[in-house]
Amino acid sequence: MDTFQVIILALIQGLTEFLPISSSAHLILPAELLGWEDQGLSFDVAVNTGSLLAVVIYFRHELWNMFTAWIASIFKGKQSDDSKLAWWIILATLPAVFFGFMAKDFIETHLRSAEVIAVTTIVFGLLLWWADKMSHQDLTVYQTGWRKALLIGFAQALALIPGTSRSGATMTAALMLGLSRDAAARFSFLMSVPVSLGAAILVGKDLSESSLPIDYQALTLGTLVSFVAAYLCIHYFLKIISRMGMTPFVIYRLILGAVLCGFIFL
């Protein structure tokens, strides 16, 4: 890949990973418009690592408090709001892990298509709009509870379907269950840490077993660009939803889905 392609793809990954707009839908567009080939496993690992570092650094205080409280709950039996939140995040991760292993081959074979991505981009955009407008949103992230956490976890598993958007599915479920917009976004961001880490490890394992050449300069640039884009995305997204809600992202998803349908069916 040349430098321009690295920057564009890393920007797409960083900007769309944490927005409820589907990163897979956006990664189709460069291929359709510019004829770019698949970027390969090594680049996937690099840009995912950049996004993971962004959320870890942005929420470093919350994550550290959760980690220390979680350790205390195990070894000292001390329960706190942060330890409960840590356990809920772990619980919410389990459905995606289970269904990821069980349905990986089926998804890769039958659902990873432009048609599926176009349809899910529109359908789950409408669900996000409904959840944002119709649900009663007053719970904080510390009021989630294990039942709601598990249901949000199943929504995250549903996002294994390309075009759904992990952030979009989890935020939609959280809003439907009564979490505030800020709480829904924060819970979704925190949930991304174990999932992204696990995915990076699995893809990294596949990469280590591959004999393909590695362009370390491109990977370094991709990681850096993805990190900066994702960090800024998280910061400004939290500000936008506090003022405008999810409507801008719903409109964007509908337009994007229509554009994809145009490329596919016209």
Curated annotation (Swiss-Prot):
Membrane topology: Multi-pass membrane protein
A molecular-function term among this protein's GO annotations: undecaprenyl-diphosphatase activity
Presence of keyword Hydrolase: yes
Keywords for the protein's UniProt record, in alphabetical order: Antibiotic resistance, Cell inner membrane, Cell membrane, Cell shape, Cell wall biogenesis/degradation, Hydrolase, Membrane, Peptidoglycan synthesis, Transmembrane, Transmembrane helix
InterPro entries associated with the record: UppP
Reactions mediated catalytically: di-trans,octa-cis-undecaprenyl diphosphate + H2O = di-trans,octa-cis-undecaprenyl phosphate + phosphate + H(+)
Localisation per UniProt entry: Cell inner membrane
Pfam families documented for this protein: BacA (PF02673)
Signal peptide interval: none
Keyword Cell wall biogenesis/degradation: yes
GO BP annotation list: cell wall organization; peptidoglycan biosynthetic process; regulation of cell shape; response to antibiotic
Residues spanning the membrane: 1-21, 39-59, 87-107, 111-131, 149-169, 183-203, 218-238, 246-266
One Gene Ontology cellular component annotation held by this UniProt entry: plasma membrane
E.C. number: 3.6.1.27
Family per similarity comment: Belongs to the UppP family.
Note: Bacitracin is thought to be involved in the inhibition of peptidoglycan synthesis by sequestering undecaprenyl diphosphate, thereby reducing the pool of lipid carrier available.
Protein purpose: Catalyzes the dephosphorylation of undecaprenyl diphosphate (UPP). Confers resistance to bacitracin.
NCBIfam families xrefs: PRK00281.2-4, undec_PP_bacA
The protein's name: Undecaprenyl-diphosphatase
Species this chain originates from: Shewanella sp. (strain W3-18-1)
